């Protein structure tokens, strides 16, 4: 059997973060400004933030903007009688302000937000991020990024053509340190020199991979022959730290220090190990050395400072600002400062310091009783450092100076709380980023409050002379610190959120269930994931698609094929305070068959029909500032008044071809007929008439396959002014072009000083901005100037030959020509008429069938800050979404016409399923697809695609574009506000026509929509009881650890006032409510001291009193943590959820009575019960090295039936029919069966390899079964039971077929089944869902042989032909190292992440790859669509 592994939910955990001042051009050049905001403050990009977790790399802009402060000056009940609300309507006919309205002045506050630029899933696990600048940075002014990966790899990346581009990849996986070193304890550390002269990566066996970076042109001359002179680096090499000093062993941390002429590195290492039982004789084993890399001499590493005798619990180093100097060493019990002369100053934060080290310290902060394991530190002022603990508590660390040295280190009380940190970095001036692997991350504002202190003059004796002060001046002089110390005292620092980056975090457990709101015949399973863990948990309720939440039926539109809710200005319309006049729907057009009905909308639920028009409606929109309606039918174009009456026939009926589609944007209209001819109309606002206008001044109008006229309100659509090389200075086009000119004076020349700057100066930024081509900002006409808040208007045409033309309105001048849209290129810009063919796509051959574009929509998509997108729907059902990104420089050296300053970058692509087979197209489908844009539905702006498989196309500012499917076909869609709700929309589905709304709790930031609930406790397990439809969770509470001896007597440990007591976990069982107020604890059960829940499942056991003889119970396996001096044990519990009978409302506030958790039995065990399950009505539970099957006798006690001795320690038990897979901690898994007469376990087969199994599951497909296991390293293995194979030892050994590296280690797995009928007891096909420690959800589905062979060939083509980010090989990433095999077993599981790259390739490249393997692109896309799983 074969399988496909793909990602359902990418990882959102953040392990590494990095701030880059100038990584993208938007940090140098000003952003486009919306026309409606010309008089407001600019939005400024202060820098870029790069975050990484697992295999996901994301790049953000940090945008600083001013937002109004909303103040409720008057309440509604305080408004005097007769006083009307003043509403600011959009500019229309009467755009002159009468001046009588009283307006309160707006107050603004400055905030910063994260704006996502790009996101990639790489073919490697990211282990570090570092910033650098190369020789090219002196030309374009941009920073570069270095990313390190698992298996000792470094990639140098830069920003080019609107995305990340790979400069080089450096691999060290074949060096001797990686082949023979100890990889188990290897922790890769990536560091770069502050002046970008060196990058190092730690390797096993105390070695460094060194990459010298070139910063001056003169450094290119001494390069060795054969090395590329264009490379921004010198040849890298591997340095053994023993060459520096033989005492350097066991590197704990290292970092480069700022302010040195040569690269200077600080090394923290421990030549000798110690442990807690050896502290009486050996302590203070760590050493700190500061050495210089002398690159000129090659092998010289001078020692500057050496300090020994540092605490043995040292954790990491923090570089100090130049004003403070030195290095901060963080230990688990205190903070140590080491200056450049080797002077040590320390402060302890708990009383364990004196038991661990003999180093003298300040005891002023010992009462804080902090634990610094897992903490993160960063300096925010020259003398103040923020210390963020593992639980998110923020403490300020103040360094007080005594002369020129640090005198006192003071750790202040907790100031605030942030998410549990995995990384902490400074994100510009006055901000830090707190990255978390357990959930949401913060972009936080640093609040610095200083107390005013009056400076007292100190009188000196005339005879008292300080010679140093006489020579160098008073070191306490306020002039040295810009009078800060004179006016202000010590700072009090706290953090507050600027922006929150949502994330799932580590997933502890998952469970499938049915929502209580699902009623009737249609029930959709939901996946509940428990994430978080260290402080509290988050309940994430995932659904595949956005749920249809119905408010009321709309029976008047039962047969509607298309609806238009229009905000027409009518006196009888109902006004709502929270809905702007421009969004208030007053007229409804419903196209039904060969007629169109016109309705007037009021606040009443039932609309009033006021007219009827002949023919179906293709398009309708408000016209002439919402005073009229323009309607397009297949035969005519008419102008209607605000009551739906015809006032002008714009395009009368004729014998010509029918109109097939149209686009309207007041005052422009364009129609396309069946023969692909187009007609353009322009409305006269004064005369209230619409007339035809020619598109081209000479010749015939172009023949087009798609047309669109649209309005841009974001300001992104701008144009470059024409320029000629002979009449103007050469313009540096280094940022966007591939061939960068050799400009030596890019930033004040390439001097050593400018090349080694870490950040651009304002003068350098101004010089780069002056090189920018002129961009059109003025309004092209008087009419657009008057209506500037409405935005600029543009006309887009896709000719029959596949060329996209964008023309500015109203002058109809071409500003963009490109074939990139028709060829599905990854990105495209204006070709400027210089390239006859598109660079990234191949020209179509003669006789080759064309995949035409049948609909093209330019619309904003986003939440809060919207982005302009281009949606293109092809004839085959292919949907491409392009984001319109601003450009700041042109690719060509000269251009004779205006050029659109926009780059269209593909951000999403998919194939919409069409019934009827592969050859069916959208044009002849049963229900064709149509793109319907919408605006502001619960704050979301995007598009909805009606058809056989409807989709929502939405996005948010900090997350990529998402496409969420619906389970039912949709015939019509439209946003409405006539009932007073902002989040309401009309939809006609198979169940009928409804007014629906988006739930306010719905989160659409992730790849799967979900509802999120923040819990007060941390939860480790969750399960669903199908009988009561309730969830049960196991909470983990941190309590002081209590040690017991073998007789059960309490043992006392070390005692002291400031000693931190040891803690452990104690579990409780909690029953959650359902319905309108879900996830409230309504009942529970507390376990004993030191007892933790190890496993929990919903089991179906025999129960004589139940209907059918079976009943659902909750089985819980626990274990006791008694410490290392006493043997552990466990218990098996059986609980049942019962509905209470009696008076309701007996609970406390907020409780939901009616259900309770009842304990049926408790069965003691000699070992922890790590796994429970059920089989044929019996309970399965592990007990250390044994497996038991038990029956529930009279619902009150467990009766043992059979047992099986297994290898070492069972971790998982999975059941299919009467077969079981028992996973072991060290010995892989067994394949076992159970017989009932007599009760007996039978071992069928075993896996003989030593693998630490985390999950083991059955994968079933049409009578065949295979076994899929995953281990702690994230490796997935597929094994078969094949007695006919000679190597299987007559079936006693399971045969290994495939090894596949899945990335992050799985924490839990669930198997779901696809049953063709409800009567099928056992599944003919299964799907495995995995949850990982990095917050990802992945899946494995089976693949038929013919489809697998085809997709395997596609994968081979993609490995060779697709461009992979960072230059990583996807095949090498998925290969598992196994020394027992002569060659890797890499075939058998397809890489879904790699296959998803197929849809992103240009059409020409797709056809070329498919021609080599004898298939077509539509067949491959259909295969991938069919393998999407059944959840």
Swiss-Prot record:
Pfam families: Beta-prop_RSE1_1st (PF10433), CPSF_A (PF03178). GO terms for biological process: mRNA processing. GO terms for molecular function: RNA binding. It is found in: Nucleus. It comes from the Eukaryota. Residues 721-759 are annotated as: Disordered. RNA-binding component of the cleavage and polyadenylation factor (CPF) complex, which plays a key role in polyadenylation-dependent pre-mRNA 3'-end formation and cooperates with cleavage factors including the CFIA complex and NAB4/CFIB. Involved in poly(A) site recognition. May be involved in coupling transcription termination and mRNA 3'-end formation. This is Protein CFT1. The lineage of its organism: Eukaryota, Fungi, Dikarya, Basidiomycota, Agaricomycotina. The gene is CFT1.
